[in-house]
Amino acid sequence: MPAISRDEVAHLARLSRLALSDAELDQFAGQLDSILSHVRTISEVAAADVPATASPDPVTNVTRPDTVVPGLTPDQALAAAPAVEEQRFMVPQILGEGE
């Protein structure tokens, strides 16, 4: 017995505001029946002894310790900038005057 009937597919199509032809109704009924069959098979797997998890991989902390390293001086950072004004990067204006 199919898990979903052609009438149920037509009802879902109406709810979704989809206009389906008779051939499409038959096609989608078969496809949805196959999908629901696979879901039913998966739900029958005995997973009572498997703990719930958000990820199949073990979660480990992959961060490294913070170490202080010297950074660029303002002059070094601005040296490669195409335009500088008052020790700041100059960029094209993207908003109007009043915005």
Curated annotation (Swiss-Prot):
Keyword Transmembrane: no
EC number assigned by the record: 6.3.5.-
GO molecular function: asparaginyl-tRNA synthase (glutamine-hydrolyzing) activity; ATP binding; glutaminyl-tRNA synthase (glutamine-hydrolyzing) activity
Reactions catalysed according to its record: L-glutamyl-tRNA(Gln) + L-glutamine + ATP + H2O = L-glutaminyl-tRNA(Gln) + L-glutamate + ADP + phosphate + H(+); L-aspartyl-tRNA(Asn) + L-glutamine + ATP + H2O = L-asparaginyl-tRNA(Asn) + L-glutamate + ADP + phosphate + 2 H(+)
InterPro entries: Asp/Glu-ADT_sf_sub_c, GatC
Keywords: ATP-binding, Ligase, Nucleotide-binding, Protein biosynthesis
Top-level enzyme category: ligase
GO biological process: glutaminyl-tRNAGln biosynthesis via transamidation; regulation of translational fidelity; translation
A Pfam cross-reference name: GatC
Quaternary structure and interacting proteins, as annotated: Heterotrimer of A, B and C subunits.
Function text: Allows the formation of correctly charged Asn-tRNA(Asn) or Gln-tRNA(Gln) through the transamidation of misacylated Asp-tRNA(Asn) or Glu-tRNA(Gln) in organisms which lack either or both of asparaginyl-tRNA or glutaminyl-tRNA synthetases. The reaction takes place in the presence of glutamine and ATP through an activated phospho-Asp-tRNA(Asn) or phospho-Glu-tRNA(Gln).
Family: Belongs to the GatC family.
PANTHER family: GLUTAMYL-TRNA(GLN) AMIDOTRANSFERASE SUBUNIT C, MITOCHONDRIAL
This protein's name: Aspartyl/glutamyl-tRNA(Asn/Gln) amidotransferase subunit C
Organism of provenance: Nocardia farcinica (strain IFM 10152)
Origin organism lineage: Bacteria, Bacillati, Actinomycetota, Actinomycetes, Mycobacteriales
